[in-house]
């Protein structure tokens, strides 16, 4: 996980607001002055890279929430498979909320964009959301289109993003108390069951496992969703294997 660079002064949210007021209506390059770290209630906001103009690739922004503030139980991220599953879910949660605010701040080019890495059906380790196993600190990276009118700074619209939209996304998706604890537990349990299967297969002389009842056909060639009314998979009896999973219990399929 990226650590705060030495020599960079931590500023307050009030200082950021004051800075935005000073550069409002100036030429777009003045946005470069916002690069730095700012302490908000419950997290640190870092403006890591500022785009050159409103039509360029969006600015890189990240938030760091301390493990103590985030409040996630250690058993949800103590091992690698648990941590990847939790990181994936938090990124999805943040992304869904960010979509509601995308382009609500107006302007030219990519003004008002708020986005994170898009997740497919796969649960993968991504640099977009990282949890530090020693202390539970959460780092989440996003892209934001800094608003402009033409190529003139529209700081009031960026204020909406940084002081209204982003804080709401952070508190709703990165604080354990605001999330469905049972859902998080089910997600981590599923990850542990999957990891158990992966470790058991070599012991059984197998390289793959498909559970009975799986719907393998996809909705279309460009979709990862299962086909509606698709025929559920059923293993031939001679290739059937039963595993005892830590959480789900017995599961049968083709090995």
Predicted regions and their residues:
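Glycine-rich phosphate-binding P-loop
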Residues: 250-255
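N-terminal pre-Walker A segment at the start of P-loop NTPase domains
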Residues: 219, 223-249
């Amino acid at each position: 996980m990226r650590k705060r660079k030495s020599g960079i002064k931590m500023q307050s949210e009030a200082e950021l607001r004051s800075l935005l007021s000073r550069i409002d209506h100036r030429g777009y390059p003045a946005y470069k002055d916002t690069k730095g770290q700012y302490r908000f209630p419950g997290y640190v906001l870092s403006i890591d890279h500022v785009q050159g103009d409103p039509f360029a690739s969006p600015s890189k922004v990240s938030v760091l929430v301390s493990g103590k503030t985030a409040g996630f139980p250690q058993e949800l991220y103590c091992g690698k498979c648990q941590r990847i599953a939790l990181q994936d879910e938090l990124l999805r949660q943040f992304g869904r909320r960010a979509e509601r605010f995308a382009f609500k701040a107006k302007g030219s080019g990519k003004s008002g964009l708020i986005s994170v890495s898009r997740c497919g059906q796969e649960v993968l380790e991504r640099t977009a959301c990282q949890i530090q196993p020693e202390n539970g600190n959460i780092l989440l990276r996003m892209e934001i289109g800094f608003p402009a009118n033409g190529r003139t700074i529209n700081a009031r619209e960026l204020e909406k993003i940084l002081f209204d939209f982003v804080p709401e996304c952070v508190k709703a998706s990165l604080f354990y108390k605001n999330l469905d604890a049972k859902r998080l537990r089910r997600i981590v349990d599923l990850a542990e069951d999957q990891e158990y299967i992966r470790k058991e297969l070599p012991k059984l002389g197998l390289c793959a496992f498909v559970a009975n009842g799986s719907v393998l056909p996809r909705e279309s060639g460009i979709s990862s969703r299962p086909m509606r009314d698709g025929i559920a998979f059923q293993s031939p009896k001679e290739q059937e294997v039963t595993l005892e999973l830590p959480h789900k219990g017995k599961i049968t399929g083709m090995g």
